[in-house]
């Protein structure tokens, strides 16, 4: 019976401890994100601290005994007594997240593949680009016009918002593609230049065709080009169209993500071609911090050529925060910093949007941070 008691208690206690520690670490990071948005607003340094290790020791002790029943010995019966103790001794190591490697990742704009990864998780392209893109460059032959994602610059900001709303409307109808541009590279070489061993190696990487008239081999290889957001399947493009788009990509940065909206497909009433330039995580925190003050977003109507937007979802702010002197009563999570409470607004018509925005911010931080070192750095160890 004693063994059974200990066996039942220990897994339950362990499960509760694992969940409690997981909640505590998640809440700590969420609060740090809110604090750093506030720091960005007040132009204070951005800084993060992480939990590098949690080591918890559990001890379970059970005992048993017996005593006479309340009727005394005359009753000839014995009352069993079972007891036990449970002790938890956690050791938590806390380390600052800093150093040149992390700083470079913090300041480096996100590459295009990060945005497409999130798009495939069904995040709203409007939310993604409002948070992650610093500007859109619309191609207006023979050059690009730049429109910055900054509410302070009214004309630029409103064009930026209209472009991302247009893409969002196409996404709402499941007509938005975000795929690598499929490319085919071709080479022609004389047959005499290839030896038998080399020919076998070529066949593993290329499709090979021999032309007996010219005695040459034509080598073809399929490769993935730059990622392109479109309102059509890029696999249906002709080789000439793919090469043309790929030539344009020579001027793009790794943090640029191009789009090509064509007239003969859904959303084609406003054909456009251009590039979004993505931000770094540090810039995202700065953007959200500025939104607390005078550089807040505001309502922008979609373009008249834009198809209907699902549920007319078009919030003024990328992520709305509540700031107060008292703890917010209905917030999912809040943090106190400099005598103010900061929380993501999770009430009202855009509660889901704001939760998605904060979840996106959390994921972007995870994409930015390196593995937290476990040894060899200054740390704080808390032993209970």
Which ranges hold each PLM region?
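N-terminal amphipathic/basic membrane-interacting segments and domains
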Residues: 9-384
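C-terminal motif of bacterial Sec signal peptides marking the signal peptidase cleavage site
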Residues: 4-7
